[in-house]
Structures are given as C-alpha cells and as structure tokens.
Amino acid sequence: MPFTIDTARSIFPETLAADVVPATIARFKQLSAEDQLALIWFAYLEMGKTITIAAPGAANMQFAENTLQEIRQMTPLQQTQAMCDLANRTDTPICRTYASWSPNIKLGFWYELGRFMDQGLVAPIPEGYKLSANANAILVTIQGIDPGQQITVLRNCVVDMGFDTSKLGSYQRVAEPVVPPQEMSQRTKVQIEGVTNSTVLQYMDNLNANDFDNLISLFAEDGALQPPFQKPIVGKENTLRFFREECQNLKLIPERGVSEPTEDGYTQIKVTGKVQTPWFGGNVGMNIAWRFLLNPENKVFFVAIDLLASPKELLNL
C-alpha cells in the first residue's frame, strides 16, 4: 500500500513530543483578553531573568513600524483596547494588518510593545494586577517547563492573535526580506552519528545556510513538512514559503539518528538534536526530532519536526 501524507505522519510512533505545549496553549486561549495580555507580560518578565531575548533586526521591524507608532500615539485607554482587540481577534484595521504579518514580524512587534511598556510609552499592565486563578495556574506551568518549550508556548500564543486570516479573503502576506544564502566557503557540514543519507545531511546543511532554493529541491513534488504542533504543509510552493518566512537564521545541531528501510522502497530516518533560533541564540537549544520519510528517488516525501518532551515530562509518564 503506497504511503500517503496521513500514513507518513505515524512513522516512528514512539517519538514523545512535548504534549505540555499544545495543552498550555489551549488553556491560554480560554482566558479573557486582559488575562492573556497580563500572562504574556508576566511570562516575558520571568523569562527575562534567565533568557536574553535578542532585539529584532531593522529589516524585521520596518513592516510593523507604522502600527507601533500608531499605538504609541493613542491614549492609554486606546492602547489597552488595541492590545485586547488583538487577543480577541477583533475585526479592526490593526488586527487585519497584524494578521498579514509573518510570525517573526509578530514576535518583533510584541518585543517592541514590551520595550515601550518598560519605557512608559505604552500603557503597561496595571500595577498590582492580579491574574485569575486559571491564568496563574498557566503561568506556573510555563515557569516549570524548559526554556525551549517556554519559547514555543509564548510564540504560538502571540502568532495566533489578530483577525482570523480565513475571514480576510485575499490579502498580501507580509514577511521580512529573505537573507541571501551563506557563501560555500563559510558553511560547515553537519555530521550525524548513525546517519549518512545525503538528502538528510543536505537538508540540515542547506537550512543552516539559508539556502532555501537548494533545500526545496530535496523535496518530492507532492512532499510535505509538518512543523511542531501543526498540520502538514503540502507541496513545494507552500513549504518554500514556510522556510523563507519562519526558518531564516536557524542553527540546526543534529546529533544522532537511525535509518530504516520500509515498504515500497521508501526509507524512514529519525534524527535528534537541538535547534537555536535567532531570537535567543545560544541561550536556548530546543530539543528536536526530525522524522523523515524518503521516497525511492531519495526525495523528501514527508518530514515532521517534533519538539521533544523534557526529561521531567518523561519521568511523569
């Protein structure tokens, strides 16, 4: 029976993803807008004690600058309302603009808002604000998970804000400029204990070099990529857009893996290692598994990227 994207998702079923992440995000979305904003603020303050967040580059922020300045010029009450509108996914011009941005621009926008709050330029969370019992329980959960999981929770919480893109009709996606690939002389080839497959090694090397055109050439025409806690992205065009919008300047540090032949001439390969993002650099390495299914032509038919469970989660199983 030939593989489908759906059946491919079940390769290496023993892989233990960080279930605490989607569970925490689901609980977060049930909170009031005020509690969501306060929780993000308190969580960032908490993270700031142990994690250094890198300032977004100017190229990222040029697209958000007008919106940020618009919010700065509002009254404190209007500023609070604008942020609540984002959390409530209200249909406003700011929420529509926000919805069109790539995840990195959204993250940069919230970074700048946090800086403005610190400087007193934007209405902060009211002094003495008390989180609801549910929000406080979520904050305690976030405090107890590892840094890579904290980042993923907070990222997904803010990325999903703004007006629902499915209701926008046709709209212009806004993403930061694509950085040029690294020169060949500057690239360092990865080595993975237990894996010598050229497609997998090139996948890692090309992604580390921001060489997205050569990266996408490794995929089958009907291939798919499944980001952590998301549905598969199918087709080369959609996958290439994902790489360009969400994977610039990542540092993949694969460590070891296993390769197994499977039915119909396909090969399944699992690699584990770490990924560092430009937002947090070497401060935080997210524990990742890559689950590849390669077709008989050695092209990527499917790859799932899993944020792995922490040692603490594994002990609780």
UniProtKB/Swiss-Prot annotation:
Q: What is this protein called?
A: Orange carotenoid-binding protein
> How does it associate, per the subunit comment?
Homodimer.
List where this protein forms a coiled coil. none
Q: Briefly state the protein's biological role.
A: Acts as a blue-light photoreceptor and photo-protectant. Essential for inhibiting damaged induced by excess blue-green light via a process known as non-photochemical quenching (NPQ). Binding carotenoids improves OCP's intrinsic photoprotectant activity by broadening its absorption spectrum and facilitating the dissipation of absorbed energy. In the dark or dim light the stable inactive form (OCP-O) is orange, upon illumination with blue-green light it converts to a metastable active red form (OCP-R), inducing energy dissipation, quenching cellular fluorescence via NPQ.
Gene3D superfamilies for this protein: 3.10.450.50, Orange carotenoid-binding protein, N-terminal domain
Q: How does it sit in the membrane?
A: Peripheral membrane protein
Show where the OCP N-terminal domain sits.
Answer: 18-169
Required cofactor(s): 3'-hydroxyechinenone
Q: Does the keyword Glycosyltransferase apply?
A: no
Residues that, per the record, bind 3'-hydroxyechinenone: 37, 203, 290
**Taxonomic superkingdom:** Bacteria
Q: How is the cofactor bound?
A: Binds 1 3'-hydroxyechinenone molecule per subunit.
Is the keyword Thylakoid assigned to this protein?
yes
GO molecular function ontology, one term from the record = chloride ion binding
Q: Which family does it belong to?
A: Belongs to the orange carotenoid-binding protein family.
User: Where is it mainly found?
Assistant: membrane
| UniProt PTM comment | Proteolytically cleaved into a red 16.7 kDa form named red carotenoid-binding protein (RCP) which lacks 15 residues from the N-terminus and approximately 150 residues from the C-terminus.
Q: Can you supply one Gene Ontology CC term for this chain's record?
A: phycobilisome
Q: Where in the cell is it found?
A: Cellular thylakoid membrane
**What GO biological process terms are annotated to this protein in UniProt?**
light absorption
InterPro entries in alphabetical order = NTF2-like_dom_sf, NTF2_dom, Orange_carotenoid-bd_N, Orange_carotenoid-bd_N_sf
Keywords from the named record: Antenna complex, Chromophore, Membrane, Photoreceptor protein, Phycobilisome, Receptor, Sensory transduction, Thylakoid
